[in-house]
Structure formats: structure tokens, C-alpha cells
Curated annotation (Swiss-Prot):
This is Vitamin B12 transporter BtuB. GO terms for cellular component: cell outer membrane; pore complex. Residues 43-157 form the TBDR plug domain. The keyword Glycosyltransferase does not apply. A motif (TonB C-terminal box) lies at residues 607-624. InterPro entries: B12_transptr_BtuB, Plug_dom, Plug_dom_sf, TonB-dep_rcpt-like, TonB-dep_rcpt_b-brl, TonB_rcpt_b-brl_sf, TonB_rcpt_CS. It is found in: Cell outer membrane. Its main location: membrane. NCBIfam families: PRK10641.1 (NF007926), TonB-B12 (TIGR01779). The gene is btuB. GO terms for molecular function: ABC-type vitamin B12 transporter activity; metal ion binding; porin activity. It is a multi-pass membrane protein. Disulfide bonds: none annotated.
Amino acid sequence: MTIKKYTLLTALSVTAFSGWAQGNNTTDNNNEMVVTANRFPQPKSSVLAPVDVVTRADIDRWQSTNINDVLRRLPGINIAQYGGPRQLSSLFIRGTNSSHVLVLVDGVRLNQAGISGSSDLSQIPISLVQRIEYIRGPRSAVYGSDAIGGVVNIITERETLGSTLTAGLGSNGYQNYNGSTQQKLGDDTTITLAGNYDYSKGYDVVAKGNTGMASQPDRDGYLGKMLWLGANHKFNEQFSGFVRGYGFDNRSDYDSYYYPGSPLVDTRSLSSRTYDTGINFSNGGYASQLIGSYSRTQDYNYDPSYGRYDQSATLDDISQYNLQWTNTYQLGLGNVGGGLDWQKQTTEPGTNYLSNGYEQRNTGVYGTVQQFVGPVTLEGAIRGDDNSQFGWHTTWQSSAGWEFVDGYRLIGSYGTAFKAPNLGQIYSSTYGNRDLKPEESTQWEAAITGITGPLDWRLSAYRNDIDQMIATRGVYPNSRYYNVEKATIKGVEWTGSFETGPLSHQVTLEYLDPRNADTHEILARRAKQQVKYQLDWQMADLDWSVTYQYIGQRYDSVFDPITYAASPVKLAGISLWDLAVSYPVTSHLTVRGRIANLFDKDYEMVYGYQTPGREYYFTGSYNF
């Protein structure tokens, strides 16, 4: 795509876009609009950072049963999970920590419970997801804390009128039932309702007790329920508004350390509620959006024999208030943007091992710019955050792209980012340290993109230096959080997509060197090499999908059950294949089948925790 074409698309984007949080699909993947990169709508092809978009059609074609199964297919992502679906998981982008990933839901920061400060995406129902926008690289200058490795924006709004009912069955007693509908009330109001129920008997995620704990022969299953309700209203040609609320309740079983004579805490019960409302304004080249949001997450871990309210149980109870005002203005051959973010988090006593309730507030102000100057694209952003705990923090980033030949572009970028410590890391009587400072990073990336015949490709090389990393020091019960580590992460990444007749191909080749800058040890649970291949085609009314992933060897730790001392252990590399097929029985009814881990490979993503092995799924969907 030439500079002239996406300059025109960007110039038209402000007036063409009706809802910033939702994104927009088009038939041309390069021209589809994304909102996550710079917080204003722009064609995907005009964004200098690497961007991937997953639609609901992709999720249905791949027949993914959880968000981690979707994200593992995308470039730059490693996932470590303590077993199978709904077990605790970590998401690593380009070798950074799982706490270095900013997760948004409909453009609003996800409420994160837990002392690690990481988002556990295994708990978000896949039926809630209508679209995912995924940005690799630093984005703290746009969003503030957490966006060191990248940003994942989960969009929940159904994009088309109509109704869908789905039922599915699968291995390990898996059941899923969900439905959604979007209907017009008059000419200017749209109502959306969705619900989901899923269940699995599960399997024993630690069958042999080889994590150092005693063997606990049982099934580690889960049960989840979700409800989503929203309304959009167009007041006139300039103003529109929305209100939405959603919640989910999950219960999952896991294997935990057991001490004879004491309760066995091996059940997690997570309840999450979120309520958003907002108003959009658009007039000529100017657009503005104001959103207010409230969410509360309650995360219990307990022994079901004693109950959630026994003294052996733990509860992370966090409320989050968000207010964000976003503006963009068409200026010249590009856009300028800016806005204000305000957030308050409060905790109840007991959360993250806190003896008292605490509160943390953050106010951020930012500005962005994108301009086209002949064959050159320029991007920049700057942001300041005032945090009630650690004060003022400034981040910035800049990028430039030069289309030196029609269809080929050189890109260079540099940016700073940070991760603020959470309330548990600061105030916990067990692990806390009130002198903690934010983690900081500096990153650069050089890339070349091109369209060579049918092949649309990108080659990137990057380096990320992270300082003041937060980690525990000492052996339990005398361990504390400190700013003690540094990391240097280097990587090379090639992505390409092309079509050969009816076949659609997507390929990712990655080499990653993530190291502790002081000890030069490889960071845990990151693969140095990954190969990902997605093949989709249609034949005789059958839609086929084949997924291949090679994950190189990784390093993990095994802990002595008496001394808690850690020893390194190597996890072998693995090649995984998935096969999925769907068939439209009628114009309304589609049946789908999937085999996950086609060759029944035995592997681990976290040492000692089993993955499910080969699994079978069958689903039917009815649209009307």
C-alpha cells in the first residue's frame, strides 16, 4: 500500500468512526481500522508498530475455547500455564514479564487482582470476545504503566445485528452453551445481550507430584458463567452514547502444596463485575470520547471442605474506578491527539496479604501525533503520570517510516516505558516494600516491511533494556519485594501472510534472547525459538483450519518443599498441530469440529504441570 492511500484513509478516519472502543472490520486487512495503537482510529497499514487483529470470525474458524488458545497463535507471544484451561497462566510478549502487558477491555484498563500485578487471561470467557487488537512494543507514552511489552485490547461489543445460539461438547466432560443478540429499538438505539455457561470435569494437572508437592489424584475442572448487556444510542449527527455492564463468575480446581493436618487450599472462585458508560462527539475533523468505568474483582482461594470464609482462605478484593477523556483532531496530512486518564484502586483488608485496606490514585495526561510528509510517516507520543505512591513519571516514544520504494518501508522507533508496583507489592505485611520504585525500560526497534508479489511481510529486530525490575529476595517467610534485577532482551521476528489459490497462509519465525543482565541467565519460561503457521482454506463447502506451533526449549525452576530453594530445570521443545473444520448445514446452522494437539504430544508449559493431551470438540451454531 502506498503512502498516498493510507494518508487519505487516515484523514477520513475521524469522521468515519462512530465508536472508539469497538474497532471496525473491512474486507481488506490492511485497510481495517484499529484504535489501540495511538488511541485514535487509523488504518492498520498506517501504524508503524507491529499490529495484529483477531476477529470473531477467526475465533470461530479456529474454534478456540479460551483466550490463551487465540493469543498463542500471534507473533511475539509465549504462554505459560499451570495445566489446562482456567488454570493460572502468564502471558509474555517479546520476552518481557507477564506484568509488562497492558490488558484493556473495550479500551479500559482491566482490573487486575493478585500480588503479581499480572493479568490472568485464562479467566476471561472466550464468548465475551468479539475482537482483539494486539500491539507489540512500548506503549506507556500512550497508556501509562504496564505497557512495556505490548497492549492487548479485548473488544466485547457484537458488531452485527441478529442473534446466535451455540452449544458445544468436548473432551474431559467439556460443555459450553452461549447466546447473543443485537437488536434495533427504533432508528437510533441498539441493544445487545449475551450470556455464556461452560463446564469441564478437567483432569489431574499434577498427576505425579513432580513439582515437589505430594501427589493429589483428582480432577481439576472448572465452571463459568457470564452475562453481558449494553445499549448504544445516537442522539444526533454529532453525539452518541453507550452504557454497558458485564460480569463473570468462575470456579476452578487446581493442585496446591499440602501440609498434613492443615487445610488443602486447591479451589479458586473469581467474581468480576464491570460497568461502563460513555459519550462520543464527532464534528468535522475533531472527535472526542469520555468514558467512566467501575469494576470490582473478588478472587478467593480456599479449601472447599472449610469454605471461602475460613481463616485458611485468601481473598483479593479490588475495586477500580476509571475516567478517561480522549481527543483527536485531523491536522494537515495526519492527526494529533491527547487526553486525560484518571484511575483509583482500592483494596479491602486481606487483599494481597494486606492487613488494612489501601488506596492508590493515578492521573495521566498524554499527547500523540502522526503526520505524513511525502514518503515519510512520523509518529510521536509523550505522557506524564502523577501517582499517589511514587509521584511523577514521564515517558515518550517516537517512530519514523520511509517508503523508499512503492510497497516497501523502513521503520525505526525508540520509546520508554514503565511498570508501577501494585498495592500488594508495596504494603503487604508478608512481602511488601514501601520503598519500591517503578520498573523502567528503554526500547528500540528497526524494521522493514514489504509486499512482494502475494507476500505481505515484516522483518523486525528489537532490543529492550529493563531496569529496577521488581523481584522477591530471601526465602519464605523472610522474602520481600525489591528493585534488584535488570533484563536485556534482544529479538528478531519475521511475519508473512500470502495466498496460493484457495489457501491462506500466515507464518511467524522468531528468535528471542531474554536474559538477566546481571547473571546472563535466560529468563524463565521464555522460548528462544518459535515457529507459527496458520493455514486456512475452503473446499467443497468445508472450511478447514490447520495450526502448527513449534516452541523451543525453555528453563523453569523446581522448588525444594522443605527449604523452598529453587533449582533450574529445562523444558524440552515441542511441535503442536491442531485441525479444525466447519460445515454450513443450512444458511443458519453451522457445525464445527476440532482436534487439539492432533498427535497427542506430552509436554509442559510450567514444570510439573501436565497439559491435556489430545482433545476433541464438537460445536453447533444457529444464526437468525
